[in-house]
Design a protein with these regions (language model features):
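N-terminal accessory/pre-domain segments preceding catalytic cores
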Residues: 1-111, 125-137, 154-155, 230-325
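Short acidic/His/Gly/Ser-rich catalytic and metal-binding motifs that mark active-site loops
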Residues: 123-126, 171-173
């Protein structure tokens, strides 16, 4: 049984900013549900004529784990086991060795891990579960995918942490992620932002290097933005951080998966519609990349005309949460 002191040391206990986000998100969702009972009844399930979500096939084989495989995990901060993120799990250790752990430089390995997670694992809105389940499944939320990157780095002896922030998003992703379901759209518009988004960071050669592993190249192409590389942040390109909400932490805090858990319990149909929309985005982006002549051509072309804008959301009456700089 983990002690309260250890929970606090490993940052399982939510920070003040996160608690504000969690409470504000819960109150906003409650208000949406209480004032829109008709929408909840209509949207909570998928009806017979609607498209159903089919999880994409995992595009990689699970490398075999062998006893005695080396791993660099210690009890040192940013190298140890944290909530949902066990760098000693056999699936993590085997995958880390498959990607070149202890054979490549720290930078080369972290970059390889970034590219694997970003391009091989796909976004799926689902409840939080351990990192090894994400590797077996091949899908997960942004925090599932970030946890895979962090676990791989820690397994290879590279310190890694989470960077979190409340965010709003570029218009195309707003349309796909939020506009696909009226209940989720009303929740987002009530708050003016989504509760929490994040990125991974790896400590290499004395500095923290950001790793935005959430979107595949195809989803970024569907959004009309460049394909982010290792060391490039999503903030200002894919997402826009709400001022005063950016934090770094060793672990996912308790309660982070509450939104997805609540959505699945109350309105599983809404969750399924979002996941269907994500797969439509992947298909759209794949064609855009093919028409552009490949990922490199698309990326070079898009970087020349970068100019994404946030969705227009009226925040004039959003008085529930105020964040300091």
């Amino acid at each position: 049984m983990i002690s309260f002191r250890e929970m606090k040391d490993r940052e399982y206990i939510p920070h003040k900013t996160y608690l504000k986000l969690l409470i504000g998100g819960g109150l906003s969702l409650s208000k949406v549900l209480l004032t829109n009972p008709g929408d909840l009844k209509k949207l909570r399930t998928i009806h017979g004529s609607e498209e159903r979500y089919v999880r994409p096939k995992r595009p990689y084989e699970l490398p075999p784990f062998k006893e005695g495989m080396r791993y660099g995990v210690t009890e040192e901060k940013y190298l140890r086991h944290t909530l949902y993120c066990n760098p000693c799990a056999p699936e993590v250790v085997a995958l880390a060795h498959h990607l070149g752990a202890f054979q490549k430089t720290d930078y080369e390995f972290a970059k390889t891990a970034f590219e694997f997670v970003k391009e091989k694992l796909d976004l799926e809105i689902c409840p939080m579960d351990p990192v090894e389940e994400t590797i077996r499944r091949g899908t997960g939320t942004c925090f599932h995918l970030i946890s895979v990157f962090i676990a791989l780095c820690r397994c290879a002896g590279i310190k890694a942490r989470y960077k979190t922030f409340a965010m709003n998003m570029i218009q195309t992703w707003y349309d796909a992620m939020v506009g696909s379901d009226q209940l989720v759209k009303k929740w987002y518009d009530q708050m003016g932002f989504f509760m929490m988004e994040g990125e991974g960071e790896a400590f290499i050669d004395g500095k923290w290097i950001v790793a935005h592993v959430g979107p595949t190249a195809e989803r970024q192409a569907a959004g009309g933005i460049p394909i982010t590389k290792f060391g490039e942040s999503s903030i200002g390109v894919w997402f826009f951080a709400v001022p005063g909400t950016t934090e770094t932490m060793e672990s996912i805090p308790y309660g982070l998966g509450a939104g997805a858990n609540l959505l699945k319990m109350i309105a599983p149909g809404s969750m399924e519609r979002i996941n269907i929309s994500i797969q439509h985005q992947n298909k759209m982006g794949k064609k855009i990349i093919e028409d552009a002549g490949g990922k490199e051509s698309y990326d070079a072309m898009t970087r020349k005309k970068l100019g994404s804008k946030t969705p227009i959301v009226d925040l004039s009456n959003k008085k529930g949460i105020i964040f300091g700089e």
